[in-house]
Amino acid sequence: MSQPVQAQSFQQAPTKVLVIDDSNTIRRSAEMYLRQAGYEVILAEDGFDALSKIADHQPRLIFVDIMMPRLDGYQTCALIKQNPKLKATPVIMLSSKDGVFDRARGRLAGSDRYLTKPFTKEGLIAAVNEYVGPSSIAS
């Protein structure tokens, strides 16, 4: 007697999210919140570090701090959006500045959204869900 063929279950890989911030505290907070929600998190300390990690990991969403040494968030965002392969990748600016000028400058650089620090877990996850949807894998 033959055994019935069982359907194989394929586990979908978690959505990759890149967090770029020169503050270790901010990176670790974002990492904790996002991992708890089931996302794979890649961390970068500055724009230069981020550009190589973007090529290696191809994240579906990028959070970038505005105020960073060497290559700031505006410059990093502009470089990401100028790349035809990355242009559609959502970029969310992170900043403790909440002025109209800062938001406008972020838009001019190509950002999709602006999130003010300190952020909450709910605010961070809502921003991710808006662009890539909820994670299919819950931790």
Go through each PLM region and give its residues:
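Charged docking surfaces used in two-component/phosphorelay signaling
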Residues: 28-36
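Short hydrophobic/Thr-rich beta-strand motif most characteristic of the beta2 strand and flanking loop
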Residues: 38-45, 53
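Active-site beta3 strand of CheY-like receiver
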Residues: 57-63
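Receiver (REC) domain active-site loop signature in two-component systems and cognate sites
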Residues: 68
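C-terminal output helix
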Residues: 119-128
